[in-house]
C-alpha cells in the first residue's frame, strides 16, 4: 500500500465520499429522516459498515491536518470539554433545560444557582460538540438532538453521572498511583483508592453503598446500549439457537440487560442472572418496571452469587462472563473460572465476552482507541489491564488442562470478542 501522505489523503477522502453517499441514500429512503445518525447496529449491514468506514476515514483525515502544536492544542480542548461536561452534569443542567422549547441563560442560571457568565461559557463550549443549541431569541438555550437523548434516557444519565463522579476524578490520580505503587497489582493500590481515599478494592467500595451499587449497575447497562458495546454483537457472535432450551448462566449479569437481549432474540433459551444480593434486589425491581412480555420475563431468574464462590448451577449450556474477568487480576480470574469447572456438564461451554487487545495498528484506529482507553481505565480502577489472546490462553491453561479456547470471534463494529471455551 502506498504510504505517501498524498496517497493516504486521497484514499481516506474517497472513503468518506463513498461511505457518506451510501448513508445519505439510506436516510433519504426513510419515511421520517432522523436528526442524528441511527446506531450502527440498528441499520442494514451495508449502512452500518459504511458508518464505521466513514468514522475511521474522517478520524484519520482530521489527524492529518494537525501539526504537533495543534495536537497539544486539541488535547487542551479535549480536557476542557470533559471538564465542562462534568460541570454541566454536576449542576444538573441537562435536566434543567426543557426537553421541548428553550430557557433563557438568566433563568437557567437562577434555577441552577450558578453564575450566568460561567453557565454561558460552559454551555457554549459543549455546543461545539453538538450538546445544546441556542434557539429563538438571543440569550435562549435549548437541547440539541444529542443532548436531548442524553437527558431523556435514565441509563445514559446514570452513565454520565458515573463518568463525572468516578471516572474523571480517578483518571486525575493516574500518575500519583504509579508514583506511589510502581508495578503493584494489588486491588487496593489504584488511582481510584487515591481519588476516593479508601483502602479496599473498587468493588468493595461500590458494594458498601447501595446508591453506588445502583449507579454502577445502571452505567454498565448504558454502556451496553452504545454501538461499540451493543449486546446485539453478542447475539450475532454464536449460533445461540443451537442450544435449544438450554440454560445460560449470566455471571455478574447486573441488571440482566444482556440476558434480556438474548431472551428477546432466542425464545427457547432460559437464563439465570447472578450478581451480589443488593444488585439482584434492584435488578428484579427494574425488570418488573420495564413491563416486558411474559414470554421474556418468565425465562429469566435472578440469583445472589459471588463470582469467587463455587458455581451452584450445574450442567448449564453456557456460563457467560461478559465484561467480568477483565476487572480481575490473573490470579482471581483463574479462581473465578475454576469455580465453574465442577459445574460443567459434558456439553457445557464457558463464554468470555471481553476485549482481546490487537496488535498495534492492526484494526481501525477508532476501535483500537476505545480498547486502549479501556485498558488504562481498568488499571486506574482495578490494577488490571485488558488482555491479548495469548494472555487469555495462558489464563485458561492455568484453570485446567482439559479446557481450551476453541473459537474467537469479534463482530464487525464491536469492541468485545467472544471466546468460546470447551472441555477437550
Curated annotation (Swiss-Prot):
O-methyltransferase; part of the gene cluster that mediates the biosynthesis of aurasperone B, a dimeric gamma-naphthopyrone. The first step in the biosynthesis of aurasperone B is the production of gamma-naphthopyrone precursor YWA1 by the non-reducing polyketide synthase albA, via condensation of one acetyl-CoA starter unit with 6 malonyl-CoA units. Keywords: Methyltransferase, S-adenosyl-L-methionine, Transferase. Disruption phenotype: Leads to the accumulatio of aurasperone B and fonsecin B. This is O-methyltransferase aunD. Pathway: Secondary metabolite biosynthesis. S-adenosyl-L-methionine binds at residue 275. Coiled coil: none annotated. Its EC number is 2.1.1.-. Belongs to the class I-like SAM-binding methyltransferase superfamily. Cation-independent O-methyltransferase family. It comes from Aspergillus niger (strain ATCC 1015 / CBS 113.46 / FGSC A1144 / LSHB Ac4 / NCTC 3858a / NRRL 328 / USDA 3528.7). The active site is at residue 326. One of its GO terms (molecular function) is O-methyltransferase activity. Gene3D superfamilies: Vaccinia Virus protein VP39. GO terms for biological process: methylation; secondary metabolite biosynthetic process.
Amino acid at each position: 500500500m502506498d504510504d505517501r501522505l498524498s496517497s493516504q489523503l486521497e484514499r481516506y477522502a474517497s472513503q468518506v465520499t463513498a461511505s457518506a453517499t451510501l448513508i445519505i441514500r439510506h436516510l433519504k429512503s426513510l419515511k421520517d429522516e432522523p436528526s442524528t445518525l441511527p446506531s450502527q447496529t440498528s441499520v442494514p449491514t451495508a449502512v452500518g459498515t459504511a458508518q464505521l468506514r466513514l468514522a475511521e476515514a474522517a478520524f484519520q483525515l482530521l489527524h492529518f491536518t494537525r501539526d504537533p502544536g495543534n495536537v497539544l492544542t486539541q488535547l487542551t480542548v479535549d480536557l476542557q470539554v470533559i471538564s465542562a461536561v462534568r460541570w454541566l452534569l454536576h449542576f444538573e443542567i441537562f435536566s434543567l433545560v426543557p426537553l421541548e422549547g428553550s430557557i433563557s441563560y438568566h433563568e437557567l442560571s437562577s434555577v441552577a444557582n450558578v453564575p450566568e457568565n460561567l453557565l454561558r461559557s460552559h454551555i457554549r463550549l459543549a455546543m461545539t460538540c453538538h450538546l445544546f443549541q441556542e434557539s429563538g431569541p438571543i440569550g435562549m438555550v435549548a437541547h440539541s438532538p444529542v443532548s436531548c437523548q442524553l437527558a431523556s434516557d435514565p441509563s445514559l444519565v446514570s452513565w454520565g453521572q458515573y463518568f463525572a463522579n468516578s471516572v474523571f476524578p480517578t483518571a486525575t490520580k493516574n500518575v500519583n498511583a504509579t508514583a506511589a505503587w510502581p508495578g503493584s497489582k494489588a486491588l487496593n493500590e489504584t488511582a481510584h483508592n487515591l481519588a476516593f481515599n479508601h483502602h479496599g478494592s473498587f468493588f468493595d467500595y461500590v458494594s458498601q453503598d447501595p446508591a453506588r451499587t445502583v449507579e454502577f449497575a445502571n452505567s454498565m447497562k448504558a454502556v451496553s446500549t452504545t454501538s461499540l458495546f451493543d449486546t446485539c454483537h453478542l447475539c450475532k457472535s454464536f449460533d445461540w439457537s443451537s442450544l435449544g432450551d438450554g440454560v445460560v448462566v449470566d455471571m455478574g449479569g447486573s441488571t440482566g440487560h444482556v440476558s434480556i437481549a438474548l431472551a428477546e432474540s432466542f425464545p427457547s433459551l432460559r437464563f439465570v442472572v447472578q450478581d451480589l444480593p443488593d444488585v439482584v434486589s434492584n435488578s428484579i425491581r427494574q425488570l418488573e418496571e420495564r413491563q416486558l412480555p411474559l414470554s421474556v420475563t418468565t425465562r429469566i431468574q435472578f440469583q445472589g452469587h459471588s463470582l469467587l464462590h463455587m458455581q451452584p448451577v450445574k450442567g448449564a449450556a453456557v456460563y457467560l462472563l461478559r465484561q467480568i474477568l477483565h476487572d480481575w487480576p490473573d490470579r482471581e480470574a483463574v479462581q473465578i473460572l475454576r469455580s465453574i469447572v465442577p459445574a460443567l456438564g459434558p456439553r457445557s461451554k464457558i463464554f468470555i465476552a471481553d476485549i482481546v487487545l490487537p496488535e498495534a495498528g492492526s484494526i481501525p484506529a477508532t476501535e483500537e482507541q476505545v480498547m486502549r482507553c479501556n485498558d488504562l481505565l481498568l488499571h486506574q480502577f482495578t490494577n488490571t489491564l485488558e488482555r491479548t489472546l495469548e494472555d487469555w490462553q495462558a489464563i485458561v491453561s492455568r484453570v485446567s488442562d482439559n479446557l481450551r479456547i476453541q473459537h474467537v470471534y469479534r463482530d464487525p463494529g464491536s469492541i468485545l470478542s467472544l471466546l468460546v471455551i470447551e472441555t477437550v
